[in-house]
UniProtKB/Swiss-Prot annotation:
Binding site for ATP: I35, R36, G77, K80, T81, T82, E143, D144, Y145, R186, Y196, R233
Pfam family, any one: RuvB_N
Stretch list, region Large ATPase domain (RuvB-L): 13-196
Assigned GO CC terms: cytoplasm; Holliday junction resolvase complex
Swiss-Prot/TrEMBL GO biological process terms: DNA recombination; DNA repair
Top-level lineage group: Bacteria
Renumbered residue ranges of the record's region Small ATPAse domain (RuvB-S): 197-267
Protein name per Swiss-Prot or TrEMBL: Holliday junction branch migration complex subunit RuvB
EC identifiers of the protein: 3.6.4.-
Residues that hold Mg(2+) according to the record: T81
This protein's encoding gene: ruvB
HAMAP family: DNA_HJ_migration_RuvB (MF_00016)
Length: 354
């Protein structure tokens, strides 16, 4: 299989590295490539999704035809790209990887489509961000395996139809509701990736540690797993930070105590909240009495981008019950108050009931 990429709580603490974001693109890519599982046997977690895709793969191979187009949705860092590569490996085809922001002009997507071989997989990340012209070019490509190109303008314009080999489009999105109905309806399979359980993350961490030649105890892996926000990408990143810590401190293995010490330094607490999570919650509590408050108001008060708050931080805060969305806005929950050591639960409960 060939892989091709198209380039295109308390008082506010001192700000530390944000572990929900990449340190450098190259560093992250190198790490992910070195530890990426190559089959569903190696892929930990997402059992229901793996069962479905295993059936789809076997059926497609039996009929000697490509898989149906697949839409994967869920929070970032859960393994959408990895799944597309595993699918390509299982089908014995190439996988071309791109992202919607890189497909600005019609020729960007047409160049990719005409370069596909029979059965190839085209993976488009952030597919909800496709512009209208690019999206409309995909309609006949997905449905009829042809590319409709308009040549000329005005009355002299004419349409040329170019046949395409049968291929599989795998789209990935964090905002499935932002896809247009015509695009969403052309996917034969729509599957959601869920946050991982701490036990699953501990298994991922142990596997990664072995590949990185780093010794780690069961308890050490569990400690990192608990603080990884249900996300393998973050688990692997935290593991690397803890590995740095034990190497500098001259320890031989990652234990629970050392993992906790290291992650406390990076201000990743036992619930997986980092500096920005606590800033968001603290701002909502101190400036907006816990809510309800709109997303734009939170963004303005914290200095964070509204889209980043909504797509990167909110999903986990909602998942663990620290934040609620109401028709009037976001509301901090009682358990979040308790975790941050704040008071004001009675006032919070009044807002929650409205």
């Amino acid at each position: 299989m060939a892989i091709k990429r198209n380039q295109g709580s308390n008082p506010k603490p001192e700000k530390k590295e944000r572990l929900t974001k990449a340190e450098t693109h190259q560093e992250q890519d190198n790490l992910e490539e070195s530890i990426r599982p190559h089959s569903f046997d190696e892929y930990i977690g997402q059992k229901d999704l793996k069962d479905v895709l295993s059936i789809v793969i076997e059926a497609a191979k039996t009929r000697n035809e490509p898989m149906d187009h697949l839409l994967l949705y869920g929070p970032p860092g859960l393994g959408k790209t990895t799944i597309s590569l595993i699918l390509a490996s299982a089908m014995g085809v190439n996988c071309k990887i791109t992202a919607a922001p890189a497909l600005e002009r019609p020729r960007d997507i047409t160049g990719l489509l005409v370069s596909l071989k029979p059965g190839d997989i085209l993976f488009i990340d952030e597919i909800h961000r496709l512009n209208r012209l690019t999206e409309e070019l995909l309609y006949p490509a997905m449905e009829d395996y042809r590319l409709e190109i308009t040549i000329g303008k005005g009355q002299a314009a004419r349409t040329r139809s170019i046949p395409l080999p049968k291929f599989t489009l795998v789209g990935a999105t964090t905002k499935v509701g932002s896809l247009t109905s015509p695009l969403r309806d052309r996917f034969g399979l729509i599957q959601r990736l869920k946050f991982y359980e701490p036990e699953e993350l501990a298994l991922i961490i142990k596997r990664t540690a072995k590949l990185l030649n780093t010794s780690i105890t069961e308890q050490g892996a569990a400690e990192i797993g608990r603080r990884s926000r249900g996300t393998p990408r973050i688990a692997n990143r935290l593991l690397r930070r803890v590995r740095d810590y034990i190497q500098v401190k001259k320890f031989d293995s990652i234990t629970q105590e050392l993992a906790a010490e290291a992650l406390d330094i990076y201000q990743v607490d036992p619930q997986g909240l980092d500096w920005t999570d606590r800033l968001i919650l603290d701002t909502m509590i101190t400036q907006f009495n816990g809510g309800p408050v709109g997303l734009e108001a939170v963004a303005a008060a914290t200095g964070e981008d509204a889209k980043t708050i909504e797509e990167v931080y909110e999903p986990y805060l909602l998942q663990i019950g620290y934040l609620n969305r109401t028709p009037r806005g976001r509301v901090v929950t009682t358990v979040a108050y308790q975790h941050l050591g704040k008071t004001g639960e009675e006032q919070l409960s009044i807002f929650s009931e409205q």
